[in-house]
Amino acid sequence: MHTAHRLLAAVALTGAAALGLTSCLSTEPFPGQQGSRVLNDAATALRGASTFTMSGKASSQGQVNLSVSETGECKGTIEARGGGTLDVVRTRNHTFLRGDETHILAKTKDMPEDQASQARKDMTGRWMRMEATAPSMKGLTNLCDRDGLLKEIYSIQGAEKGALTKIDGQEAVTINTPEGVFLVATKGEPFLLKVTTSGPNPIDLVFTGINKPVQVDVPADKDVYNLDDKG
């Protein structure tokens, strides 16, 4: 389960996509190609895309919805440990996080009331800035590292082609492996569309928005909350 563990650490959801067989599906996707070849080509195709969005559940990070560029920049939302949701903006040099009300309340609940009140005022609607390479950002860094996220797929053994299906209206072939189930587009580029693993740390990630522009805007300084300034 090495690959599944790597994916879990990197991320990147039951029912995140609508699946269903229809009578108009092709009868033989990727004729003459083994499941391992189809899966490897799917990983290569997605790695070659300029952008993509991954959404779903990654047990190491909870629910995620992140748009990732080829340069490692990303933006979106992640589930915050301890409660709530974090807005995310990651550039090459910095990571910016902005918590929602639930997250801020969870972070300040054990503070004395006067400190908690001031902290909530300071944090509400503002971004916390950190170095992109900060150890505390390792999980997010792995999620935004598209090559690191996908390259372990090449080492998966025992991949076999399965049934045809559809995901969000797009035809896909099921690739069954000992580590999980993968859905690969059968029309156009053979992009990887979904990854599902089970076990004690299950993940279920859908890949959409492939090659659609992602604009990562850095928050203005006035909207950034600097913890160092608060002692």
Whereabouts are the PLM-identified features?
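N-terminal leader/targeting segments and the immediate start of mature chains
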Residues: 2-65, 223-231
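Secreted/processed peptides and extracellular or luminal domains of membrane proteins
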Residues: 30-31, 80, 150
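Outer-membrane beta-barrel proteins
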Residues: 34, 38-39, 150-153, 157, ...
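Short, exposed beta-strand/loop patches in secreted or surface proteins that constitute
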Residues: 44-45, 65-69, 87-88, 160-166, ...
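One face of beta-strands
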Residues: 48-78, 82-88, 93-97, 191-195, ...
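Short, basic/low-complexity N-terminal boundary segments at the transition from targeting/disordered tails
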Residues: 70-73, 136-168
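An acidic-aromatic
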Residues: 71-142, 203
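Gly/Pro-enriched, hydrophobic low-complexity segments
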Residues: 163-223
